[in-house]
Amino acid sequence: MDKIALKITFSAETPKYAQSVLTEYVNFVSQYSLNQTNQEFKQGFNLRLDELRFSKEQIEENLTEEKKVQVENLTNALDIAKKAGIKDFSRGNNISDSKLADGTYLFILAEKYLQAQLDIAKNTPVVYPANYYITDRQLFKLNKLASQLELVEDVKTYYYLSSPDYPVVKDNPKRSLILAIGFIIGILLPTFFILLGSVIQTNKKQS
């Protein structure tokens, strides 16, 4: 086994059976890989949906809470202005913007102004930022695609460099080995006898 491939070998009684086993194994691995890939993709897909939903809900909750606080501050300021008899705003009241911003001195703005602001705050719909609508569109599109995740069928996670096939004539490695050994012996034996005969003749002459 190397970094990018796994080599598997097996033997079978017939070439046809070997091809059948190979096909079944490849289909099994293909389906397993497809299931794993699909599962991982779904997890990432659903995680993205959750992130978008959370982002959208956070924007809605924050703006709703801001509007609620604004209405409460204006209502309280209006009640104080009514009790204090402050009908109209006087520019002589030198109140800084920072004091008005925290709601403590809003009553200085007087009853008429506060009532108008309160009516606007209650009746005006929440204005959402651009990223809210971008998030909403993404959610809409992804939700339409979600139903199609279950429609993945007949997908192959592999392709053949060449189609698998089996030989017409069955391979016989034992027969080939025997023939090779016989060929080698056929060459060596005559050579051995020739050398042996030569040695015997030489010994006779010397005697």
Curated annotation (Swiss-Prot):
Entry keyword annotation includes Membrane: yes
Transmembrane residue ranges: 177-197
Location in or out of the cell: Membrane
Keywords noted in UniProt: Membrane, Transmembrane, Transmembrane helix
Topology term for the membrane: Single-pass membrane protein
Superkingdom to which the source organism belongs: Bacteria
Any GO CC annotation of this UniProt entry: membrane
InterPro entries (alphabetical): Bact_polysacc_biosynth/exp
Keyword Transport: no
Protein name in the entry: Uncharacterized protein HI_0866
Species annotation: Haemophilus influenzae (strain ATCC 51907 / DSM 11121 / KW20 / Rd)
